[in-house]
């Protein structure tokens, strides 16, 4: 059962775009609208992803930042994550306003992370590509990958774990260590079909088990 109605997802995507474009024009963070459903004021984790339009998924990313834990009300978290994704992702130069004409905005609303218990070697059996996102923690190192990333790259569960370890700056087999914590979460994902276009819920299709 969906927590986020389709119309709420559309609202969040439009809000994210407006937050970015207003910040790029004026340097100001917009305030959330007042007349929105109370559910969107609940604290939830959220990520905003910016993808270049008409570019293969593996090369499309232009920025992605968010909050894995529910520390802000969803509307405020969406505004902040959108701005950070546009100007503070250390992997990319800041987005320019004119670039937004060729960028598709995507919003992922996250469930709270759930620690994967049990022996490390059983972790691949406890996650599912097409459903779960992952967080890997070891010492001061942390890495997160959203559920859609594994689908877009065609990874299986072990590859997904290894890539999340890489994202954390750790060896790819660190998920086999007892002192590595692995969390899973799910996400409801909404994206523009094209820049400023209709917003749709993004389905995640698990890999076939051939």
Swiss-Prot record:
Domain AMMECR1 intervals: 7-201
SUPFAM superfamilies named in the record: AMMECR1-like
UniProt cross-references to Gene3D superfamilies, sorted A to Z: Hypothetical protein ph0010, domain 1, Hypothetical protein ph0010, domain 2
InterPro entries in the cross-refs: AMMECR1, AMMECR1_dom_sf, AMMECR1_domain, AMMECR1_N, AmmeMemoSam_A, Uncharacterised_MJ0810
NCBIfam families assigned to the protein according to its UniProt record, in alphabetical order: AmmeMemoSam_A, PRK00801.1, TIGR00296 family protein
Protein name from the UniProt record: Protein PF1979
């Amino acid at each position: 059962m969906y927590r986020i109605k389709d119309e709420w997802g559309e609202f969040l995507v439009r809000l994210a775009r407006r937050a970015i474009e207003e910040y790029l024009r004026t340097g100001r963070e917009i305030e959330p609208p007042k007349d929105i459903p109370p559910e969107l004021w609940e604290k939830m984790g959220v990520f905003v992803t910016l993808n270049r339009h008409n570019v293969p998924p593996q090369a499309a990313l232009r920025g992605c930042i968010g909050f894995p834990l529910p520390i802000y009300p969803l509307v405020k978290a969406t505004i902040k994550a959108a701005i950070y994704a546009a100007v503070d992702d250390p992997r990319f130069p800041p987005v320019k306003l004119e670039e937004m004409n060729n960028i598709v905005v995507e919003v992922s609303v996250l469930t709270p992370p759930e620690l994967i218990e049990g022996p490390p070697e059983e972790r691949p059996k406890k996650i599912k590509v097409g459903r779960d996102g992952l967080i890997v923690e070891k010492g001061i190192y942390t890495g997160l990958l959203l559920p859609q990333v594994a689908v877009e790259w065609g990874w299986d569960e072990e590859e997904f774990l290894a890539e999340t370890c890489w994202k954390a700056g750790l060896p790819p087999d660190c998920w086999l260590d007892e002192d590595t914590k692995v969390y899973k979460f799910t996400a409801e994902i909404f994206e523009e079909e094209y820049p400023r276009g209709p917003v749709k819920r993004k389905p995640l299709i698990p890999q076939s088990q051939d």
